[in-house]
Swiss-Prot record:
Annotated keywords: Glycoprotein, Glycosyltransferase, Golgi apparatus, Membrane, Signal-anchor, Transferase, Transmembrane, Transmembrane helix, Virulence
Gene: MNN14
Annotated protein name in UniProt: Putative alpha-1,3-mannosyltransferase MNN14
Pathway(s) annotated for this protein in UniProt: Protein modification; protein glycosylation
Stated induction or repression of this protein's expression: Induced during biofilm formation.
Length: 685
């Protein structure tokens, strides 16, 4: 019987029933889609299926093996949300085969809980090394604190219960804080990959890897993915004002800014990078060093433009005028310098400017200069060669990032420092889904991880290709914000290379040699003064100095640069001359305090250099030879003097022997002339 033959009243009821069924189906569809949009239901997107064989997991683990030192970390909580109630193999296969980068980004950020997306730069993390002690150490130290000066104090069972509760609470908070930091850094890195770096070459390789694999899943083309960017730059970088710094050319007096569309500030900055140049950051306190460096650059016939980064309250009008005069006033007919002052204050929201005090200014200098290739120089650094030559160093040309090592001293980090740094590294999922590479043995071979050495990098001079490593200062900034990270490094030094490893960018190089001592070799007579029965000679040689210096690993001879100015002691305002003169362990050739004072204030004389051994200490030797590669001569130059040794112990092992370099008369004369230029007086009003 056809529909037309049904009585009118019955037909009416039937149409109503049909309408209700259709309405229910439509409603269910929209409810499902709404849930999918919030990341709650991904069943049809990343469906569980028994048709994905175990061989696929083997294929993934072969091509993306978990790196053992970081494999024990849980990874981002977002991945747990994403794969919840899903078969991991089916989900990953679906993503690799069907999702482009934009869809992967949306999938990730839809699974981030809103309250876990951002950690405010002012987030009050508690960091106390006491909380990282093991139970026995924590208990004993807690009892000691309770005891105080009361020798008769005995801890009760109630005291011990309280101590145990505090211990457990501290460990729980540490685990929670580290997971929060890990997840936040994951969000930052993935955002940068999605919307700034946009490297998609890894996806093409994945398609080639699974080409021909057509395992069936119930995947439906990403209907919940809108094509609209879910997370904005303003959300991810709340400390950026989205406004341009002010670039003031001293030669013309012209101030310029760049225009950026809303939420594309960083892309605009990146796209405007061009050329090579020198970058510095100073405040009024550094103006003397900076003027002397400008004089030195003029003598070296520098032609690279210079950008000096500062914040509004740090550099006075008088200092700006002095910089201008130092760059253009007649100076032995030497070339003028092209200097631009960069006021970065407008680019940072006022409430976050304090996060970039002191060492943090260097991060702003790396981020806001406009050079594609930059050489960052501390105001008190001394260049021996024309800056252009640094860009020709092989390791820089091969990687676009060249760093220099610090003194190889025997100072070490606790295990929990190492564990925290490793916690920030990329996971296997980061590499599979976003092409963010896991670290390799290259990172683990760096002395911080390999030997737990505290000081790896000396950051007075840094070479960086900004376009190749654009995200680096963004990660550095976030490292600098948070106390559990900031308190584990000294200033900015280790952040330069750690930030790159955290991104998964191991395309950076270190000059092979650790920092050297430069000056004059200590005489035999000076060294034997402290021995009751001195040896007839020493295997090792010694230089005591206040200036970390850097020798090229291309010829194991050329002095490239050193830090701490050209004055023999760069801490004169802190020196107690009578006290330092009274110590006779070194510098005993000066028989009056006036001679001692004159030497302290004079230009450094460079005749030789010692690169100490790679090993920091040795138990071998006959008691006369040094057991450490560097000895801290704390009584001198307000604690800044270190003595370097060419060998330690018996010097029988290769890593117990360093390198002694004796410079030619021509080289010594060049160093002398540089010292004269740097030490020369000036009067810029």
């Amino acid at each position: 019987m056809g529909l037309l033959s049904i009585p009118y009243q019955s037909k009416s009821k039937l149409w109503i029933a049909i309408f209700l069924v259709v309405w229910s189906l439509i409603s269910m569809h929209f409810i499902w889609q709404s849930q999918a949009n919030s990341g709650l239901i991904l069943k049809n997107e990343l469906s569980s299926t028994s048709s994905i064989p175990h061989e696929f997991e083997m294929l993934i683990d072969t091509n993306y093996p978990k790196f053992k030192p970081t494999s024990g970390h849980s990874g981002s909580q977002t991945y747990s949300n994403l794969f919840k109630n899903q078969d991991r193999n089916a989900a990953i296969f679906t993503i690799l085969k069907n999702f482009d980068l934009e869809q992967r980004c949306q999938l990730y950020f839809k699974n981030v809980k809103n309250d876990k997306l951002i950690v405010d730069p002012d987030h009050d993390f508690k960091f106390d090394r006491f909380d990282y002690l093991n139970w026995d150490e924590y208990r004993d130290e807690s009892i000691k604190r309770l005891k105080g000066d009361n020798d008769e104090f005995v801890a009760t069972s109630s005291d011990l219960d309280t101590i145990k509760k505090n211990f457990d609470k501290a460990k729980s908070r540490i685990a929670s804080d580290l997971q929060l930091l890990h997840d936040y850094f994951s969000h930052i890195k993935i955002y940068n990959q999605c919307y700034i770096d946009r490297n998609t070459s890894f996806i093409k390789k994945q398609h080639e890897l699974i080409d021909g694999l057509n395992w069936k899943t119930s995947f439906k083309r990403s209907s919940f993915l809108s094509g609209k960017q879910i997370v904005t730059e303003q959300q991810m970088y709340p400390w950026l004002s989205q406004k341009s710094p002010e670039y003031n050319c001293l030669a013309t007096g012209q101030t310029t800014k760049f225009a950026a569309n809303k939420n594309s500030f960083l892309n605009t900055l990146k796209n405007n990078l061009n050329g090579k140049g020198i970058v510095m950051t100073i405040a009024d306190a550094h103006i003397d060093y900076c003027i002397r460096l400008i004089h030195l650059l003029r003598y070296l016939k520098n032609t690279l433009p210079i950008q000096i980064i500062y914040t509004s309250n740090d550099l006075s009008a008088e200092s700006k005028s002095q910089l201008h005069q130092a760059s253009v006033s007649d100076f032995d007919g030497l070339p003028q310098q092209n200097i631009t002052l960069v006021n970065v204050t407008p680019a940072i929201k006022p409430q976050y400017l304090h996060k970039f005090n002191e060492f943090g200014n260097k991060i702003l200098a790396i981020l806001f200069n406009t050079f594609e290739e930059m050489i960052f120089i501390d105001a008190d650094a001394i260049l021996i060669e024309n800056p252009e030559k640094f860009f020709q160093l092989t390791k820089y040309k091969n990687s676009g990032a060249l760093f220099f090592r610090d003194r190889n001293t025997s100072e070490y980090r606790p295990d929990h420092d190492i564990e925290m740094f490793l916690k920030l590294m990329n996971s296997q999922y980061d590499e599979i889904i976003f092409g963010l590479l896991q670290i390799t043995e290259k990172t683990m071979s760096i002395p911080l991880f390999d030997r737990k050495i505290s000081h790896v990098m000396e950051s007075g001079l840094v070479l960086l290709n900004r376009k190749v490593h654009f995200s680096q200062p963004l990660i550095m900034a976030n490292m600098n914000f948070f106390e559990p990270i900031r308190e584990r490094v000294y200033g900015d030094k280790e952040m330069f290379w750690l930030s790159l490893s955290i991104i998964g960018d191991e395309n950076y190089q270190f000059n092979s040699h650790p920092a050297a001592a430069i000056g004059q070799l200590t005489t035999y007579q000076e060294r034997v003064k402290t021995f009751e029965n001195p040896p007839s000679s020493f295997k090792s040689q010694e230089i005591c100095a206040n200036h970390p210096a850097h020798i090229s690993d291309e010829d194991n001879h050329t002095l490239l640069w050193f830090n701490s100015g050209f004055q023999f002691c760069n801490q004169l305002e802190k020196v107690n001359y009578e006290d330092e003169f009274s110590h006779k362990e070194r510098y005993s050739q000066f028989d009056t305090i006036d001679k001692f004072k004159t030497f302290w204030q004079s230009s450094l004389v460079i005749e030789s250099a010692i690169i100490p051994p790679e090993n920091t200490n040795s138990n071998g030797g006959d008691g006369y030879e040094p057991s450490v590669s560097w000895k801290h001569m704390e009584p001198y130059c307000a604690g800044y003097t270190w003595c370097a040794y060419s060998s330690i112990g018996n010097g029988d092992q290769a890593n117990d022997r360093g390198l002694v370099i004796n410079y030619s008369p021509e080289e010594i004369e060049h160093f002398k002339k540089l010292g004269e230029i740097w030490m020369r007086g000036y009067n810029y009003l």
